[in-house]
């Protein structure tokens, strides 16, 4: 059996984490089986679909590196195909025209609600012999079976059954001639030879209707797998207040795509007790049967932990590629300073996100005229003048600018003055970084560079002289 899956978002908003997880699961299932993955944009809602949303979906998929074999297909470009199938169904009598007015349908709905019944179409036009002309307003409905049931073996939830008596005759073409979502999906899955439909559990009620239409068309019925929803850590449906933002917001906030993918794959799927998965491991181990039926809770702290792990365990060169985007957003020019891969190595332990890292690395590239007020008040006091002058002299005398020689200069200054490293290191840290926190002084001073470090020490000495005056 040829495995072929699809991700079919509606472009009415950003690609959120739930959609991204569904895309990932569909992608992994196809890649695990050596199959194909299709991207399809379900843009039949003409009023709500936007180009911005389409761009956001594409950006999110590309950032996550979820590549596709076919597409992107757009449903709005396939209306002729859908309508041709509907016209065929009218001829085959598996669909019929419904001329019921909005007023009649609304009255029917109100009466059913009053009687405690489930609102559904009563089939008034299903077998009507009333004469109507084609130019009268009408919709086209699918002639759903009235007996029996629809049973499908959900690959996550097991067998699910719906009585056909609970399913009314679905509208498949609107009054304006446009086909409806549920019908377009069926024709697309048929034409694109989709073998497995992996989607959110909110589509479970659509499945029996779509299966009945597929059977009426004589089309093969794909396998279905419905993924549970994602909850916030308070047990409620995930929303913006939980951080349910678009995927690209996670990029903007400094998360690596590898970390987000690792987090999303574990949000409902497991392989033993393993927490960290490379993309290759995900593809090797992923099965639909290992997806949990129950809802999963989104935990930002866990995502941050994973991101910190990836920052420190991925090759620094790869992390630096993503860091470059954040540095650019801050307008930091990196030509006259250390390579970004070295920044990753220097700041990786301290920073949980790349955004934090970009904000923290500015002093490696940009000079400053003022020091952090609290740090300067505490460490750039008159008593710090002698250690700074002494360490400056040793740093200026270095001919081979290496971290080891920088370390020896700082340690040698402390030894000669008979003071602890902190008496030299803390004033030096504030002098060269402008603040009270940084990685180790030897690697920090080395990365900043000899001339720039000496100039900043001179600025600090001038600051101290001002306090002495």
UniProtKB/Swiss-Prot annotation:
A GO molecular-function descriptor: tRNA binding
Record bears the keyword Transcription regulation: no
Top-level taxon of origin: Bacteria
GO CC annotation, single: cytosol
Cofactor binding annotation: Binds 1 zinc ion per subunit.
UniProt motif 'HIGH' region: location: 9-19
Key words of the record: Aminoacyl-tRNA synthetase, ATP-binding, Cytoplasm, Ligase, Metal-binding, Nucleotide-binding, Protein biosynthesis, Zinc
A biological-process GO annotation: glutamyl-tRNA aminoacylation
Tagged with keyword Zinc: yes
Class of this enzyme: ligase
Cofactor(s) for this UniProt protein: Zn(2+)
Entry's localization field: Cytoplasm
Sites where the protein binds ATP: 240
SUPFAM superfamilies to which the protein is assigned, alphabetical: An anticodon-binding domain of class I aminoacyl-tRNA synthetases, Nucleotidylyl transferase
EC number: 6.1.1.17
Motif 'KMSKS' region: chain residues: 237-241
Reactions performed catalytically: tRNA(Glu) + L-glutamate + ATP = L-glutamyl-tRNA(Glu) + AMP + diphosphate
Record-listed Zn(2+) binding positions: 98, 100, 125, 127
InterPro entries tied to this protein: aa-tRNA-synth_I_cd-bd, aa-tRNA-synth_I_codon-bd_sub2, aa-tRNA-synth_I_CS, aa_tRNA-synth_I_cd-bd_sf, Glu-tRNA-ligase_bac/mito, Glu/Gln-tRNA-synth, Glu/Gln-tRNA-synth_Ib_cat-dom, GluQ/Sye
HAMAP family linked to this entry: Glu_tRNA_synth_type1
Similarity section: Belongs to the class-I aminoacyl-tRNA synthetase family. Glutamate--tRNA ligase type 1 subfamily.
Role: Catalyzes the attachment of glutamate to tRNA(Glu) in a two-step reaction: glutamate is first activated by ATP to form Glu-AMP and then transferred to the acceptor end of tRNA(Glu).
Protein name as catalogued: Glutamate--tRNA ligase
